[in-house]
Curated annotation (Swiss-Prot):
Positions marked as site (Cleavage (non-hydrolytic)): 187-188
Record lineage: Bacteria, Pseudomonadati, Pseudomonadota, Alphaproteobacteria, Rickettsiales
Assembly with partners or alone: Heterodimer of a large membrane-associated beta subunit and a small pyruvoyl-containing alpha subunit.
Protein name (Swiss-Prot/TrEMBL): Phosphatidylserine decarboxylase proenzyme
Gene coding for it: psd
Modified residues (Pyruvic acid (Ser)): 188
Organism of origin: Rickettsia rickettsii (strain Sheila Smith)
Length: 231
């Protein structure tokens, strides 16, 4: 039984219906044409690959902000946070992480703390790599207060191909760094907003690993050693 549980654990539940559908179509195609069946099997294998849900070794500290997603650090700039969260006109540092079709699309909590507010905003489906995607695209914005009191924002943004955002959080949730909280299908972007004077530990063009790459350390002067947990 544990083997079956482990098998389902490594695939995000959002992928079950797609994988089952692709597998069924592949079986039907194979009964008519072997080549079409092979194409269907390849498509099914890709679907399994897309919805993979691997464990990560998460650095544990109340001072850390880790990447909520796999992808490329596409942009780092000062920008206003999503207006729907009511944070006013104070700019923050925005770190934008672009996910392509081959990245893991499961999203993770970037820090220890409490969820203060959530807001889903329907919108357009511009290419997620464009700067205007942060403003106009469909998005799910989350405001949280870290265990040390800092307020940060993380935003799931739909893209040209991604047409579904899944967020399992609720206002008032106490959350831990690296916990899985959602997924975006298929190809997308995640923005993280941090206080202006935050010292970043990532740079533009860097590859980020969700749940592992440290974006910022608010206690950097105190220690550079962390414990790690597999999640």
């Amino acid at each position: 039984m544990k083997q079956y549980n482990d098998l389902f654990k490594i695939i995000h539940r959002e992928g079950y219906i797609f994988i089952a559908s692709f597998a069924l179509v592949s079986f039907l195609l194979a009964s008519f044409n072997e080549k079409l069946g092979c194409i269907g099997c390849i498509a099914t294998a890709w679907c399994i690959y897309f919805f993979r849900n691997p464990d990560r070794f998460v650095p544990i500290s109340d001072d850390l902000v880790i990447s909520p997603a796999d992808g490329i650090i596409q942009e780092i700039k000062e920008a206003l946070p999503p207006p729907e969260l009511g944070l006013g006109d104070v700019e923050m540092i925005r770190v934008s992480i672009f996910l392509n079709l081959f990245n893991v699309h499961v999203n993770r909590i970037p820090a220890n703390g409490k969820i203060l507010a959530l807001h889903y905003n329907p919108g357009k489906f511009f290419n997620a790599s464009l700067d205007k995607a942060s403003i106009y695209n469909e998005r799910q914005s989350v405001l949280m207060e870290m265990a040390q009191g800092q307020k940060i924002v993380f935003v799931q943004i739909a893209g040209l191909i991604a047409r579904r955002i899944v967020c399992d959080l609720e206002e008032g949730n106490e959350v831990k760094t690296g916990e899985r909280y959602g997924i975006i299908r298929f190809g997308s972007r995640v923005d993280v907003y941090l206080p202006l004077k935050t010292a970043l530990l990532v740079s533009k063009g860097q590859t980020a690993i969700g749940g592992e790459t440290i974006i910022a350390d608010f206690g950097r002067k105190k220690t550079t050693e962390f414990k790690f947990e597999r999640k």
